[in-house]
UniProtKB/Swiss-Prot annotation:
It is found in: Cytoplasm. GO terms for cellular component: cytoplasm. SUPFAM superfamilies: (Trans)glycosidases, Cyclophilin-like. Keywords: Cytoplasm, Glycosidase, Hydrolase. The keyword Cytoplasm applies. Its EC number is 3.2.1.-. One of its GO terms (molecular function) is hydrolase activity, acting on glycosyl bonds. One of its GO terms (biological process) is peptidoglycan turnover. Belongs to the glycosyl hydrolase 170 family. It catalyses: 6-phospho-N-acetyl-beta-D-muramate-(1->4)-N-acetyl-D-glucosamine + H2O = N-acetyl-D-muramate 6-phosphate + N-acetyl-D-glucosamine. Involved in the recycling pathway of the cell wall turnover product MurNAc-GlcNAc in S.aureus. Catalyzes the hydrolysis of MurNAc 6-phosphate-GlcNAc, the disaccharide product of MurP-uptake and phosphorylation, yielding MurNAc 6-phosphate and GlcNAc. This is 6-phospho-N-acetylmuramidase. It holds the Pfam family MupG_C. It comes from Staphylococcus aureus (strain USA300).
Amino acid sequence: MTGFSVYLGQPLDEAYIKRMIKQGYQMIFTSVQIPEEDDETKYHYFTKLLNLLKHEQVTYLIDANPSILTPSFYDHLRQYDAQFMIRIDHSTSIEAIEAIMAQGLKCCLNASIISRELLTSLHQQLNDFTLLSFCHNYYPRPDTGLSVDLVNKKNELIYQFNPKAQIYGFIVGSDLRGPLHKGLPTIEATRHSHPVVAAKLLQETGVSEVLVGDSLIEMRQAKQLIDFCKHRHFTLCIEEVFDTTVTYLFDMCHKVRPDNPENVIRSETSRQICPHSIQPQFTTQRRIGSVTVDNLNNGRYQGEMQIVRQTLSAHDNVNVVAQIIKEDLPLLSCIEPNDTFDFQKTRECKK
């Protein structure tokens, strides 16, 4: 499940929220315990959010202190046909967890500070430990985000107690939330990363569910992120195609070969549909992000499309037919065997 964040101390960006749900995002993270937010204001906008999406299938992950989980709070949630998960940041106890579960709600614990002692105690005392999920912190202040190693160790610890646990982690968005405006990542190394690169690193540590921490992510990146998380699919933006005789290759979906090499991304499907001889032209140096097609000099490889990941010298048998834009170059390191990809022209990417 991939999610985004909505903060309640300011008017809702309803158009953005609806676009994200339409894109396929199914979870919303929000908090009712941010100190600088007025209580009356945040509960007003929380109600507006619930009403806005009352006909959508959405799971809400609500960051809350057990002290504010009153009967009236639970009664308010029951008015809506939605899934609610309460994240306890601190003050974790068996009693607090059981009180949440007794209301028919799921409970989420702070994965960043979880300990073996707490997990052991919960595993022994809870009726159904598998109902717990876990969510890491985000870190607004630069240089305070977690290391890859620490996140990996915390996740490994959780999986020892429940191999199928849901573990959430945060990545940075586009409109960086105040007051620091430095991004809200779980892992410090991803503070300035493309969202897909950040999501991939989280997944490699064992995080199963990715959340955008900041209050907004640009729509094209939002689409790239959901496509990656749900389908392992990549849409790459290119400058105009240099060779119009191979435009058919840019109107189709490609699958990466299962034995894909290190320096290039090979399309498994491109050679199968080569409709004509491809003459040698544009046989220039292959830069990172160059899209190439083998010409007739390469015999049975004629028509094979590749995307270059490391700078390669010019070759008489290889035509350079397009170039991926700078903003999408980080995605090349994320593409793996059996993934799929397609292309958009620059003018289409800006729509």
